[in-house]
């Protein structure tokens, strides 16, 4: 009699995806983040679902409903802070996951990579809309500033912004639709994750050497299930430390003030995970230029497979490319810091230099250094 795991149609999919999946024997902990992202998504959907049971998406009651969740709902404060800090963990894992892909050349699986970039956009959109829902000062003004950027689009911009707002300013209609989309998008993301995995399982995983590992594969379970559980324990530990000891560390104090259209906060800034993009947006003293730079800062990931000039896939054996990669990481940290600073000297020029360096590394320096490395190795 055949094992039900291998014969039952639904079980077969799970068996082939998480149990008998052939995986390279040498993938490091950098390959943990895929499963961690899946767990983050599940956690966000669950906590979000329970929060939505008590939240009201009306400008008059939104702020108070969030306060009510924290004060009156059983363990409502745990739900809220798990959801808010879970988003931070989600983005930490996302950026590490993308960084791993860049370092080890995983982007050569173009279908998987492109679906991943679309997923990144979808998660960023979801997080932005979620930040608007508590209807604090930073929620309101963040929504106003970011949606207003669309008015830079020639000809249709102004009408587009009013259409998104559902009126002449960010108001009740805006909040209601943001809640609707914030609820809907994670389920679309879940479906896209399945497409992401479908494309990945067509090729199998990459590995740190960037050399095909078809001759040395091991089953996913028990080796990588156990390895992933270690990563999960570490992530849950960090998340619980955040939630239980300093739940507001990554938030903005301004968001504890109810939204007031008549009073602008002195420094409007997004959550920490958008600060690098915000710095790139602000570094260009032109509205349309800034918006284009903002979109391109993420969209540039799509063309990375086209910019790969090296004969080697991974950066593991390319010290010059490694130096550039870590320079890029340092540059992103710099821009994250700049995004949270006021628009004044010397922050303006630092932000502009960081933005120029960001695009230069990806478009010019990386391909050129890879090309030079080929010649150094006489390839």
From Swiss-Prot:
InterPro entries noted in UniProt: Cyt_b/b6_C, Cyt_b/b6_C_sf, Cyt_b/b6_N, Cytb/b6-like_sf, Cytochrome_b, Cytochrome_b_C_euk/bac, Cytochrome_b_N_euk/bac, Di-haem_cyt_TM
Does Transport appear among the keywords?
A: yes
Q: What is its cofactor?
A: heme b
Q: Which SUPFAM superfamilies match?
A: a domain/subunit of cytochrome bc1 complex (Ubiquinol-cytochrome c reductase), Transmembrane di-heme cytochromes
The protein's matches in CDD domains, at most eight in alphabetical order, are given as:
cytochrome_b_C, Cytochrome_b_N
Q: Which residues cross the membrane?
A: 33-53, 77-98, 113-133, 178-198, 226-246, 288-308, 320-340, 347-367
Q: How does it sit in the membrane?
A: Multi-pass membrane protein
Q: Which residues bind a ubiquinone?
A: 201
User: Which GO MF terms are attached to this record?
Assistant: metal ion binding; ubiquinol-cytochrome-c reductase activity
Q: For this UniProt entry, what is the primary localization, expressed as one broad class?
A: mitochondrion
Q: Name one GO biological process term.
A: mitochondrial electron transport, ubiquinol to cytochrome c
**Disulfide pairings:** none
Positions annotated to bind heme b b566: 97, 196
What are the GO cellular component annotations?
A: mitochondrial inner membrane; respiratory chain complex III
The alphabetized UniProt keywords are: Electron transport, Heme, Iron, Membrane, Metal-binding, Mitochondrion, Mitochondrion inner membrane, Respiratory chain, Transmembrane, Transmembrane helix, Transport, Ubiquinone
- Function as written in the Swiss-Prot or TrEMBL entry: Component of the ubiquinol-cytochrome c reductase complex (complex III or cytochrome b-c1 complex) that is part of the mitochondrial respiratory chain. The b-c1 complex mediates electron transfer from ubiquinol to cytochrome c. Contributes to the generation of a proton gradient across the mitochondrial membrane that is then used for ATP synthesis.
Tell me which family the UniProt entry assigns to this protein.
Belongs to the cytochrome b family.
Assembly notes: The cytochrome bc1 complex contains 11 subunits: 3 respiratory subunits (MT-CYB, CYC1 and UQCRFS1), 2 core proteins (UQCRC1 and UQCRC2) and 6 low-molecular weight proteins (UQCRH/QCR6, UQCRB/QCR7, UQCRQ/QCR8, UQCR10/QCR9, UQCR11/QCR10 and a cleavage product of UQCRFS1). This cytochrome bc1 complex then forms a dimer.
Protein name, UniProt field = Cytochrome b
| Provenance organism | Myotis myotis (Greater mouse-eared bat)
Q: Which gene encodes it?
A: MT-CYB
């Amino acid at each position: 009699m055949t094992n039900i795991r291998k014969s039952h149609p639904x079980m077969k999919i799970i068996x082939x995806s998480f149990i008998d999946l052939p995986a390279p024997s040498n993938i490091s902990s950098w390959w943990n983040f895929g499963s961690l992202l899946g767990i983050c998504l599940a956690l966000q959907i669950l906590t979000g679902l329970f929060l939505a049971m008590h939240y009201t998406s009306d400008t008059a009651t939104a702020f108070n409903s969030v306060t009510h969740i924290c004060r009156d709902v059983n363990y409502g404060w745990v739900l809220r802070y798990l959801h808010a800090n879970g988003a931070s963990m989600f983005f930490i894992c996302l950026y590490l996951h993308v960084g791993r892909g860049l370092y080890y050349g995983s982007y050569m699986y173009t279908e998987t990579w492109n679906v991943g970039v679309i997923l990144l956009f979808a998660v960023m959109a979801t997080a932005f809309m979620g930040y608007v829902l508590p209807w604090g000062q930073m929620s309101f003004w963040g929504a106003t500033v970011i949606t207003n950027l669309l008015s830079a689009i020639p000809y249709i911009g102004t009408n587009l912004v009013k259409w998104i707002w559902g009126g002449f300013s960010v108001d009740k209609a805006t909040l209601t639709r943001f809640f609707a989309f914030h609820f809907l998008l994670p389920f679309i993301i879940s479906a896209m994750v399945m497409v992401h995995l479908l494309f990945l399982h067509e090729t199998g995983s990459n590995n740190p050497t960037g050399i095909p590992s078809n001759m040395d594969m091991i089953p996913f379970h028990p080796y990588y299930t156990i390895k992933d559980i270690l990563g999960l324990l570490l992530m849950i530990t960090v998340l619980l430390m955040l939630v239980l000891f300093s739940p507001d560390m990554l938030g903005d104090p301004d968001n504890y003030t109810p939204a007031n259209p008549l009073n602008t906060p002195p420094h409007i800034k997004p959550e920490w995970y958008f600060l690098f993009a915000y710095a790139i947006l602000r570094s260009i003293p032109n509205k349309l230029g800034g918006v284009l730079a903002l979109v391109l800062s993420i969209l540039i990931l799509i063309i990375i497979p086209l910019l790969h000039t090296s004969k080697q896939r991974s950066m593991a054996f390319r010290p010059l490319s490694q130096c550039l990669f870590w320079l890029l990481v340092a540059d992103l940290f710099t821009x994250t810091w700049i995004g949270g600073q006021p628009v004044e000297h010397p922050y303006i020029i630092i932000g502009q230099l960081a933005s120029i360096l960001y695009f230069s590394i990806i478009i010019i320096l990386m391909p050129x250094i890879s090309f030079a490395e080929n010649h150094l190795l006489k390839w």
